[in-house]
Amino acid sequence: VVPDLTIFGKIVAGGYPAAGGVGGKKEYAQLMAAGLATGKHRAYVGGTLSANPLSCIAGYTAIKEIERTNACEVAGRMGDRLCDGLKALIDKYGLPFVAYNQGSIVHLECTGAMSFDFSSMSFIKSAMGLLKHKDMMYVRKDSMERMGAAYMANGIVTLAGSRLYTSLADTPEIIDEALERFEEVFKHVKKTDKGLLA
């Protein structure tokens, strides 16, 4: 996928607050304008902190540091290590889970994923499938919350009980320790009529 425009939040400055960025293809970026003389056929792009010098230098420094340390590749390798370890644990305990990695974002699905049908381009029609199966949605939500709480009780912080992020700071030893903690949770998982309990 090659986006027409990409918008970044504070990650563009290594987590520094009040930072963001917009980038994209020239044909679209040239239609952006700032200041009073935006002219016809241009979209005004600006904000309170636009071109803030401190945010700009934070962003520049973050990008240079990412290049110097090869941070994205390192984080991706640690994501692969975590994902491979999770898959091995899932197999070991015969759990109906799915783990996959997208760069440095590891997904751990402990219950069926929700899906929308956007073919009609109507939110109402798209959401109808979910509404027809709302009992399953509640079971899914409950299972995810329980698994997320079990992870947290074992020192694992996830996003919504299903996503984990690796970074340059993660080492093989840190990933292995995380996998030991996941194993503590996985060996206690039980399937019930109300979903999975840990």
Identify the residue ranges that each predicted region occupies.
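Conserved N-terminal phosphate-binding loop of PLP-dependent enzymes in the Aspartate aminotransferase
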Residues: V1-A198
